[in-house]
Design a protein with these regions (language model features):
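Active-site and donor-binding regions of nucleotide-sugar-utilizing enzymes
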Residues: 1-66
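A nucleotide-sugar donor-handling region in carbohydrate enzymes
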Residues: 47-104, 136-137
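Donor-nucleotide binding loops and adjacent catalytic segments primarily
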Residues: 91-171
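Acidic donor-binding loop of glycosyltransferase active sites
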Residues: 170-181
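Short hydrophobic beta-strand element within catalytic cores of glycosyltransferases
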Residues: 175-177, 192-201
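C-terminal "capping" alpha-helix adjacent to the active site of nucleotide-linked donor transferases
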Residues: 216-217, 224-242
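A short, well-ordered alpha-helix in the C-terminal region of glycosyltransferases
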Residues: 235, 242-256
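C-terminal alpha-helical cap of glycosyltransferases
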Residues: 255-270
Length: 270
């Protein structure tokens, strides 16, 4: 039904952004448009698309009209210039697990901070940036935050869909994020990152980025382990050398021209 609805759109070009299309689904669209473009698609339907642009997921073999690799990352360019050099101390941590926190990683993060070994220094600021969520979960987070603040003289801001998201992100000394587009928005700004996966394909992304020395994986595979996570947070907070190492590598990996490249590809179709 969805494919039928899309096929009725009056357009020469259709751009799809779906993780895993099927050949049958894409075949309903093939021929209904002059050009069928699929982005970050690792499904069987990608073979049906006229053009594939995969900036995040690189599992497809290279072929004509396939643009694969980080050089085609389509990222928000706001506040790139605000990122300062790495501070000697971590004063500001930004935490974001995407618009939909499937695994409730925010709860895992907050409960981890209750660990007695967690090094939360005085006057540390934490921005917990969340998407759409129910009131029950929000109230549980507020209770966890209250318990954390009872033991630590820090500040935790719980912000739902903040309008200044990228501004806050750009000012982070350390970020804890999931493995979707959020991790690329973060490391492209040269911010040291601890990554936690929402899904198995995100784990694959995070492992690949860790191998390139631009992030640290905060989980044991898909397993969330508080002790392991807190030890890593402590290491990142106390080691300027580690943060600078990740930051320098991320700046080398991303040239911030991915959005321009993608727009040029799409513009050439007109």
């Amino acid at each position: 039904k969805e494919a039928d609805s899309i096929s009725k759109l009056k357009s020469d070009i259709i751009v799809l952004d779906r993780l895993s299309t099927t050949g049958n689904w894409m075949s309903h669209l093939k021929g209904k448009f002059k050009t069928l473009v699929s982005m970050d698609d690792i499904g069987s339907g990608a073979a049906t698309a006229d053009i594939v642009i995969n900036g995040i997921l690189h599992d497809l073999p290279s072929k004509k009209n396939r643009y694969i690799g980080y050089k085609y990352l389509f990222l928000e360019n706001k506040y790139f210039s605000l990122k300062k050099n790495n501070n000697k101390k971590v004063n500001n941590i930004v935490v974001s697990f995407g618009g939909y926190d499937k695994r409730n990683l925010a709860t895992f993060f907050l409960k981890s901070l209750l660990n007695k070994n967690c090094l939360l220094k005085k006057n540390l600021n934490i921005d917990l940036l969340v998407g759409e969520i129910d009131h029950k979960t929000i109230n549980s987070w507020k209770m966890l935050i209250k318990n954390i603040l009872a033991d630590h003289k820090i500040k935790i801001n719980l912000l739902i869909f903040p309008l200044d998201y990228f501004k806050r992100l750009s000012r982070a000394d350390l970020a804890i994020v999931s493995g979707g587009l959020t991790v690329f928005d973060t490391i492209s700004r040269g911010i040291p990152v601890i990554g936690l996966p929402q899904y198995k394909h995100q784990l694959k992304t995070l492992i690949n980025l860790e191998r390139k020395n631009v992030i640290k994986l905060g989980s044991l595979g898909m397993k969330l382990d508080k002790e392991n996570f807190i030890n890593l947070i402590n290491k990142m907070i106390t080691s300027l050398e580690e943060r600078v190492f990740l930051s320098k590598n991320s700046k080398k990996l991303f040239d911030k021209k991915g959005s321009e490249r993608v727009l040029n590809i799409l513009s050439s179709l007109f």
